[in-house]
Amino acid sequence: MTMEAKAILRTARISPQKARLVADQVRGLSAERAVNLLKFSDKKAAHLIKKVVESAIANAENNQGADVDELKVKTIMVDEGPSLKRFMARAKGRGTRILKRTSHITVVVGAAK
């Protein structure tokens, strides 16, 4: 049986396209290295993903007694959440719909073999 722990952040107020740029950088890294990389990134998505990775590490440590030094980011997925529909006034009495996109961020950490 493989030891894995998971953490999910739902309806994060960031577009999936922007969040995937950061997620691709930490996929497959050791958990400690991933947190360090995210800590020094100035992107908004990095802060959100760092919190989810730290939560997954804490889940592995507390629920399954895993050694934090042996954990790595096995999978990280950014799926599209519900969009907030907003209205922007345009010329000649018209209006345009704006989509404020949200993301579901899922992180699975497990023991590196």
UniProtKB/Swiss-Prot annotation:
InterPro entries: Ribosomal_uL22 (IPR001063), Ribosomal_uL22_bac/chlpt-type (IPR005727), Ribosomal_uL22_bac/org-type (IPR047867), Ribosomal_uL22_CS (IPR018260), Ribosomal_uL22_sf (IPR036394). SUPFAM superfamilies: Ribosomal protein L22. The lineage of its organism: Bacteria, Pseudomonadati, Pseudomonadota, Gammaproteobacteria, Lysobacterales. PROSITE patterns: RIBOSOMAL_L22. One of its GO terms (cellular component) is cytosolic large ribosomal subunit. Part of the 50S ribosomal subunit. Signal peptide: none annotated. The gene is rplV. Pfam families: Ribosomal_L22. It comes from Xanthomonas campestris pv. campestris (strain ATCC 33913 / DSM 3586 / NCPPB 528 / LMG 568 / P 25). This is Large ribosomal subunit protein uL22. Belongs to the universal ribosomal protein uL22 family. This protein binds specifically to 23S rRNA; its binding is stimulated by other ribosomal proteins, e.g. L4, L17, and L20. It is important during the early stages of 50S assembly. It makes multiple contacts with different domains of the 23S rRNA in the assembled 50S subunit and ribosome. The globular domain of the protein is located near the polypeptide exit tunnel on the outside of the subunit, while an extended beta-hairpin is found that lines the wall of the exit tunnel in the center of the 70S ribosome. NCBIfam families: rplV_bact (TIGR01044). It comes from the Bacteria. Keywords: Ribonucleoprotein, Ribosomal protein, RNA-binding, rRNA-binding. One of its GO terms (molecular function) is structural constituent of ribosome. GO terms for biological process: translation.
